[in-house]
């Protein structure tokens, strides 16, 4: 299971939101490309970027930061936020982005996702952000009655790289993941799944490791890293430990 650090961009800065609320935003001082380079130096194998401005408005305003990150690191980057056309995808690929995440556009135009996943096999990720099991769109500002599980079933026949499933109720809380929600997703698809939302400790990561054999490829972590709850290097060492099966999940050492 891969630990994937997140960089959320607003106005060219690294930020974190609480439960997706744009009014509950915390800014961090490090420049985005510097932050990405630090994650890489800590052992990260991937970088996850969300352009929050583009997710909210549909208009990309953080391309300079995105290009700076792509030039700075030598690991694959996946990016989401306001990606709604083939032209935008090709532009991001030209910057050096490895994979793109389609969220709102995937839900509103499934045929577009099907077409793009055929044109760019293995490079399109479908992002499903859910609150109480129902999908939210447009930067989590709009709530639908569509079940996340129904979307996963539908998209599982496409040539997509993976699903990213975010539980909005836990995102930014540092209070642990919605493990039951993740399990439900894994049960209905053979496509790799990346979980997001709620990780606050290494114990939270260890709780998810047992789902790796069910198709959990990775977990996205943001706030816990920014607030130094643990380091990527520490987490990688624990997750790769040969003693993992003997680790007591009730041990509070990493909590």
UniProtKB/Swiss-Prot annotation:
Instruction: Kindly give the Pfam families that the UniProt entry links to this protein.
Output: His_biosynth
- Please tell me where this protein is predominantly located: cytoplasm
The family assignment reads:
Belongs to the HisA/HisF family.
The EC number(s) given in the record are 5.3.1.16
* Record keywords, A-Z: Amino-acid biosynthesis, Cytoplasm, Histidine biosynthesis, Isomerase
Q: Which reaction does it catalyse?
A: 1-(5-phospho-beta-D-ribosyl)-5-[(5-phospho-beta-D-ribosylamino)methylideneamino]imidazole-4-carboxamide = 5-[(5-phospho-1-deoxy-D-ribulos-1-ylimino)methylamino]-1-(5-phospho-beta-D-ribosyl)imidazole-4-carboxamide
Q: Which CDD domains match?
A: HisA
Biological-process GO terms, alphabetical: L-histidine biosynthetic process; L-tryptophan biosynthetic process
Output this protein's name.
Answer: 1-(5-phosphoribosyl)-5-[(5-phosphoribosylamino)methylideneamino] imidazole-4-carboxamide isomerase
Q: What class of enzyme is it?
A: isomerase
Single GO term (MF) = 1-(5-phosphoribosyl)-5-[(5-phosphoribosylamino)methylideneamino]imidazole-4-carboxamide isomerase activity
Classification via PANTHER family:
1-(5-PHOSPHORIBOSYL)-5-[(5-PHOSPHORIBOSYLAMINO)METHYLIDENEAMINO] IMIDAZOLE-4-CARBOXAMIDE ISOMERASE
Q: In which pathway does it act?
A: Amino-acid biosynthesis; L-histidine biosynthesis; L-histidine from 5-phospho-alpha-D-ribose 1-diphosphate: step 4/9
Please tell me the species this chain comes from. Prochlorococcus marinus (strain MIT 9312)
Q: Which SUPFAM superfamilies match?
A: Ribulose-phoshate binding barrel (SSF51366)
Give the location in the cell.
Answer: Cytoplasm
Please name the InterPro entries in this protein's record.
Aldolase_TIM, His_biosynth, HisA_bact_arch, Isoase_HisA-like, Isoase_HisA-like_bact, RibuloseP-bd_barrel
Please name the catalytic residues of this protein.
Answer: 8, 129
A cellular component annotation (GO) from this entry: cytoplasm
